[in-house]
């Protein structure tokens, strides 16, 4: 018996079945950096149209978490896909380096500035600490397979960037957007500093809920405002009742706010101690119920506007306050009368400005009442709530008191409740130069330009537009000053007496920036005023405040994008961050961009959701559901993490767990196995000498290349639309359905048994080569390590890295109108599906073993029969049976099996023919060929003759 194994073209490749990514990826990374892959990409893309994704800087503190990984991987997928689309798309990663979290870490190590160390030494320690954090994070980001200029990232603490931040501020001053004022701002008493909107988080908190009487100064005048029947003005003192959940703010009360258009009732409380209360008419019953007052009736009604400027006594101080009118007063809760402390609330401040009220702030930066605060000096405000209630009770001003659970603002860093506190601060005005209106116009422009240029809103997903629009419409002036040590100085000089800015502030800021560029922000604190101000130095103070860190990052479109040579003067095409950045980086960048240049700094904004566990819960160490990117990379490899990110719809919450990552690993294996089949069957193929022209190829091979062409069109469009889960779905469908369950199955016989250098086999290899060339590029932005591995094993001449390439342009398909066009093969696929079901049933009945034991008869109506017969004897190769006979039939013949097609019936029988030892087909001529008794005539031709001819499959 002869051994024909050596005559077969068995698949062979160095591409292993197991990816073993966790072990092998680090070696690939080393090669990328040893061979300067990022530089190679830049050189290959030089002169191409630019696409700039500007990196929103993560904060330089702590290890990266799964959310960081999602963000960086999404950016990397876009950058790499843009390179493949023919763009020069440099990626400069950055870090946010100033601010409170680093200060707190350094305080824990060296103490507070001015105590054990000087402020200058403290800043130096902050700079040193930030550097160590950046290096640790950078290592993890690189391990993710993210390509960028990691050797030259931008840091907001780079001297040049610090200087450019000051220059950005100077431009805003020049454009007239800056003003100083005493306004209530979010204030953390633990930080001792103002907080930005984005640094505020909301948690449930128990607070005292109190209803408080403010007695009328002139009861007769007040009563006369109500339409009470003559002689029925009631009896007892008259009080307006306010409701508040912040009793500690009552020392700063300067008014009672009512709504001009609401109906107010004068309510007679009956009983032993009668009194008259002013309440919103719709809320009378609610207030009486919670106060436990059963006997009462309404004496009369009036509109809020009638009560404007009437005076009421403060409940425990010896002054009176007016009624003011404000649209912020609602009937959602309370009494319809709002306690107004302009120093402790944004709406209170606005209405206070309208009426010229004092902006009282009796609270120090540490949350303790100032020494001159009557009754409460030296008490912390949150502890003083009980003391305020006690005083109100003693004075007979407390109508009702209970504990109330509600959502309350907390410091993002300390997780402790914060306060609104009026302090002298520097603000970027939303109104004085029309910043709010222009920002809203830019939000609209981004949406419309996106639709015009890309067919979809510039806000991705589209709801992002409404979100940031509402925030801009309602946001207060931006408080940009902070009372911190580690930050970029505001770099202003103010007149000691008038508190006015120096008339040459813009020029002076540019002078300061020059010095900061040389030696960093410490240059400001080391600066002798006289050096810049000359003889005027004694008349001016240096402003000690630093800039809000959101100004640092929000100005990077100017301090970094405008300054870096690789961006070549282009503005950013895309900003991409988590959904919390509508009020964070997207907002600060928009405000600064419009304030500086009258234009948003981005053309598109993409938002991704937060990561949650398999049950939809936030990641939490206490719950034990944290998925660490480092663990995933060390166990499964970065490509699995990257595939999970790309496969997940980022527009909502992104669910991740060990089970979900296992599913990603399974999907990865299917893709890898397809790639392995392609490479293994390209063994011995030299595209320079063995490539077959499209016109000479076997029809099914051209069909397969055409499927790759169609898939590529969908995949490239999905990449352009940032629809990455659409990319992975199409890739999986292509590998599993079009290739795995049909084409790769069909070609095995021809690939393994045909003559090695025959047209039949080279046609197949030509198709596999084109498909591999295309598919490796589809994979490259997502499974970058695996794509690099495949690229290195492709036959023929090629560049060093797939990442310097563009989408493969060597694909072609079947011509429309050909007899065997795409529609023909689509129908063949449905027929094959029915055949597979019939073969499976026969296997289940033990009538056949493998499909090659089957002889198949297809009873088909004339039209289908004609199409099936077009494949002639090659139909059996398509259906993977040893024999396939087509019989024309109008109805189901006896003994046939019906299919889901109305024009097809099937009959499966076991072949009586002998099995060929080489191709395993059961063929009548086995045993009839002299010298080759164990094989069929077709195999004998392939072994010793000219080789078989294939036209169709």
Swiss-Prot record:
This protein's record includes keyword Transcription: no
Record protein name field: Isoleucine--tRNA ligase
Phylogenetic classification of the source organism: Bacteria, Pseudomonadati, Pseudomonadota, Gammaproteobacteria, Aeromonadales
Subunit and partners: Monomer.
Primary location: cytoplasm
Pfam families: Anticodon_1, tRNA-synt_1, zf-FPG_IleRS
Role: Catalyzes the attachment of isoleucine to tRNA(Ile). As IleRS can inadvertently accommodate and process structurally similar amino acids such as valine, to avoid such errors it has two additional distinct tRNA(Ile)-dependent editing activities. One activity is designated as 'pretransfer' editing and involves the hydrolysis of activated Val-AMP. The other activity is designated 'posttransfer' editing and involves deacylation of mischarged Val-tRNA(Ile).
GO CC, alphabetical: cytosol
Residues that hold ATP according to the record: 621
List of residues binding L-isoleucyl-5'-AMP: 577
């Amino acid at each position: 018996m002869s051994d024909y194994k050596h005559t077969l073209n068995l698949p062979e490749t160095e591409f292993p079945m197991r990816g073993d990514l966790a072990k092998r990826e680090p070696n690939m990374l080393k090669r990328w950096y040893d061979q300067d892959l990022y530089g190679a990409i830049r050189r290959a893309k030089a002169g191409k149209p630019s696409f700039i994704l500007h990196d929103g800087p993560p904060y330089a503190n702590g290890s990266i978490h799964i959310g960081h990984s999602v963000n960086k991987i999404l950016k990397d997928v876009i950058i790499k896909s843009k390179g493949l689309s023919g763009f020069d798309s440099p990626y400069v990663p950055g870090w946010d380096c100033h601010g409170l979290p680093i200060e707190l870490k350094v305080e824990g190590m060296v103490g507070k500035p001015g105590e054990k160390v000087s402020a200058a030494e403290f800043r130096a320690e902050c700079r040193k600490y930030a550097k160590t954090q950046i290096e640790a994070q950078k290592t993890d980001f690189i391990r993710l397979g993210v390509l960028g200029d990691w050797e030259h990232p931008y840091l907001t603490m780079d001297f040049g960037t610090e200087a450019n931040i000051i220059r950005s501020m100077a431009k805003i001053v020049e454009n007239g957007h800056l003003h100083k004022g005493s306004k209530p701002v979010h204030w953390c008493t633990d930080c001792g500093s103002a907080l930005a909107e984005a640094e505020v988080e909301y948690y449930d908190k128990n607070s005292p809920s109190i209803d408080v009487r403010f007695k009328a100064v002139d009861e007769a005048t007040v009563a006369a405002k109500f339409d009470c029947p003559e002689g029925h003005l009631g009896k007892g003192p008259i009080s307006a009742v306010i409701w508040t959940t912040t009793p500690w703010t009552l020392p700063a009360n300067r008014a009672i706010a009512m709504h001009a258009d609401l109906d107010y009732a004068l309510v007679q409380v009956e009983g032993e101690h009668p009194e008259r209360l002013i309440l919103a008419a719709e809320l009378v019953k609610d207030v009486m119920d919670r106060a436990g007052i059963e006997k009462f009736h309404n004496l009369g009604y009036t509109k809020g506007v009638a009560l404007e400027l009437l005076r009421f006594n403060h409940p425990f101080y010896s002054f009176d306050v007016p009624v003011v009118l404000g649209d912020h007063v609602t009937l959602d809760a309370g009494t319809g009368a709002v306690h107004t402390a302009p120093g402790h609330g944004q709406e209170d401040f606005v209405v206070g400005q309208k009426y010229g009220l004092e902006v009282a702030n009796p609270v120090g930066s540490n949350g303790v009442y100032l020494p001159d605060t009557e009754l409460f000096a030296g008490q912390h405000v949150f502890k003083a709530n009980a003391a305020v209630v006690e005083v109100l009770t003693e004075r007979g001003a407390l109508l009702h008191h209970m504990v109330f659970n509600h959502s309350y603002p907390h410091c993002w860093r300390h997780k402790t409740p914060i306060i609104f506190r009026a302090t002298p601060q520097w603000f970027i005005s939303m109104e004085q130069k029309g910043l709010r209106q222009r920002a809203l116009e830019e939000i609209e422009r981004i949406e419309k330009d996106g639709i015009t240029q890309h067919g979809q809103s510039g806000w991705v997903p589209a709801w992002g537009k409404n979100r940031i629009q509402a925030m801009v419409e309602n946001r207060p002036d931006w408080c940009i000053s902070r009372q911190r040590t580690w930050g970029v100085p505001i770099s202003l000089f103010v007149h000691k007496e008038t508190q006015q800015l120096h008339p040459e502030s813009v020029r002076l800021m540019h002078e300061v920036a020059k010095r900061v560029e040389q030696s960093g922000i410490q240059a400001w604190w080391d600066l002798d005023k006289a050096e810049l101000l000359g003889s005027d130095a004694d008349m001016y103070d240096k402003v000690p405040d630093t800039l809000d860190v959101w100004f640092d990052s929000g100005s990077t479109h100017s301090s970094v994008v405008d300054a870096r040579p690789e961006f070549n003067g282009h503005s950013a095409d895309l900003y991409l961050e988590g959904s919390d950045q509508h009020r964070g980086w997207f907002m600060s960048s928009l405000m600064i961009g419009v304030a500086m240049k009258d234009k948003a700094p981005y053309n598109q904004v993409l938002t991704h959701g937060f990561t949650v566990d398999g049950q939809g819960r936030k990641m939490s160490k206490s719950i034990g559901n944290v998925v660490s990117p480092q663990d995933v990379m060390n166990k499964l490899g970065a490509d699995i993490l990257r595939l999970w990110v790309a496969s997940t719809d980022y527009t909502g919450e992104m669910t991740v767990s060990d089970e979900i990552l296992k599913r990603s690993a399974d999907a990865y294996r299917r893709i890898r196995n397809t790639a392995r089949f392609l490479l293994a069957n390209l063994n011995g193929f030299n595209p320079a000498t063995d490539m077959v022209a499209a016109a000479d190829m076997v029809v099914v091979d051209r069909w397969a290349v055409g499927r790759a062409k169609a898939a590529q069109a969908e995949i490239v469009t999905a990449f352009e639309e940032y629809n990455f889960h659409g990319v992975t779905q199409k890739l999986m469908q292509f590998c599993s359905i079009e290739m795995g369950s049909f084409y790769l199955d069909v070609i095995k016989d021809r690939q393994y048994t045909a003559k090695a250098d025959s047209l039949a086999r080279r046609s197949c290899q030509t198709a596999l080569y084109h498909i591999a060339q295309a598919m490796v590029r589809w994979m490259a932005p997502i499974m970058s390590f695996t794509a690099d591995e495949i690229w290195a094993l492709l036959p023929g001449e090629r560049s060093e890295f797939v990442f310097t390439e563009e989408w493969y342009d060597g694909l072609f398909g079947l011509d429309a109108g050909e007899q065997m066009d795409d529609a023909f093969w689509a129908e063949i696929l449905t027929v094959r599906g029915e055949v597979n079901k019939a073969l499976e049933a026969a296997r289940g009945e033990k009538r056949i073993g493998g499909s090659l034991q089957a002889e198949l008869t297809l009873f088909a109506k004339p039209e289908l029969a004609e199409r099936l017969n077009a494949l002639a004897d090659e139909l059996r190769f398509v259906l993977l049976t040893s024999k396939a006979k087509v019989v024309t039939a109008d109805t189901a013949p006896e003994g046939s099996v019906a299919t889901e097609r109305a024009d097809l019936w099937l009959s499966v029988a076991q072949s009586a023919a002998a099995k060929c030892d080489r191709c395993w087909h059961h063929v009548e001529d086995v045993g009839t060929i002299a010298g080759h008794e164990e094989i069929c005539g077709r195999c004998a031709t392939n072994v010793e003759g000219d080789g078989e001819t294939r036209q169709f499959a």
